[in-house]
Amino acid sequence: MPRSSRHVPAGLLAGLIAVALLAQPARAQIDLREYAARRAALTARIDSGVVVAFGGVEPVNYWPTFFQVPGFAYLTGFGESDAILTMVKRNGAVTSTLFVPVRTPVRERWEGTRTRAADLEKKTGVPGRDIAGFRGAIDSLAASGLPFYIVSDAETDDFVSRDTLTRGSRFVSQLRLANPWLVMQPLDGAVSRLRARKSPAEIALLRRATEISTRAHQEAMKAAAPGCGEYEIQALLEGTFRRFGGDRPGYGSIVGSGPNATILHYMEDSRVMRDGELLLIDAATSFDHYSSDVTRTMPVNGKFSPAQRALYQIVRDAQEAFVRRIKIDVSSDSAYDAGKAVVADGLLRLGLIQAADATIDPPEGMRCPEGGCLQLQLFALHGFGGHGVGLEVHDPAQYYEEINDRWGAGDVFTVEPGLYVSPELLASLPDTPKNRAFLAKVRPTVEKYAGMGVRIEDVYALTEQGLEWLSSGAPREIPEIEALMRQREPELAGGGSCGRPRT
């Protein structure tokens, strides 16, 4: 890896892109010259050497959906499988090549038409070669003594399995075995730093992905009702994504009613909703491979009960406290502290905790900071600051500690506070004197709120012009949600009870 003191000069990528896109009309598409600027910004980080970036491989079985490796997609915009990019830098000059499989009529009858190597330069801006020539090219470059920098394909383990024996990792092992003197360094961190700052074209794609996603949330709010299956709402959401131009769900759609709303990554979507419960929907589409991430919580019967309203409003107020502190070149720490203070005050007011700094002896698997596990951690299971969005639903962001630790222009990210009162919460605590004293105080209140889960997740883009709320299309204030849910919607196909009039 390049020395930590070697950074892309501030604004280099933005400057390259600005020059490349001068006089280009604004549109929801990334120009080939922007991809060229990204590659130039990456190779600017090395004096000389060979950069090798691996695309994703075609799934062995046909039912998994192919996902391009995000780092590779960022550098090339090429969405087909089994491709490899090389960039060779010598004496300041860079030669790039995109290696792709040879087209065969039989394979194309099964998998569809692929881009020929001869057509790659027109399509991607990078000259192409058949992948059969990749090994010979690499052996020749290794013999030259140039250092190698690898942009790995390990990110694919997020999509399929935890197996890290990817094509890229095997390549590194084999190359090192054949050339033990060769200098080899990862370049993934450099790519993440570039990806963290979104260009205007990327923000436009994320804006459109979020608009489609919020439209789907509106449809879900109008359809949800007692007796409706979570799976029916899932189908409605994902159908709406496609109907309005989305590629696919950006991640597994979470449609959790009742106790399922307290499971953060619940994806079975198999339960029938009941009157008096909350419904938590965490679902969004990708658009041109850029994924949004939106969550809304609503009452199944269209009317928040007093208890539901109280829990929901704490989450909403915490989100607002966090958002008010978002500014360029500011750490997220102060925003987190502000949101946490709102949550602590709200939980104390409801009687779910004894004090803002009160602790418990944690259940198995709970991670705690120094000083012990706060009681509020039983209900606030994750941070408020969310994550970046982009080519991955959890994308790099400049305010991440390992990148810049400060918000910057071009950050696109979520703010997603949540509170969850699991029905199993009390039983999960170890039997200790401290916990017995805690339970004696809060048990009746915990039982009152048991089975309620609330999360509100919104997408924001931070630019020099200010903070843009991209997900404003999905209602999040209690009166707005209830008003939308009073609207009638035709029954879903299949005879489900979703959308029937409320009494």
What are the roles of these predicted feature ranges?
Residues 2-3, 26-503:
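Active-site neighborhoods and metal-handling regions in enzymes and metal-associated proteins
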Residues 1-13:
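Bacterial N-terminal signal peptides that target proteins for export
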Residues 11-23:
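Bacterial N-terminal signal peptides
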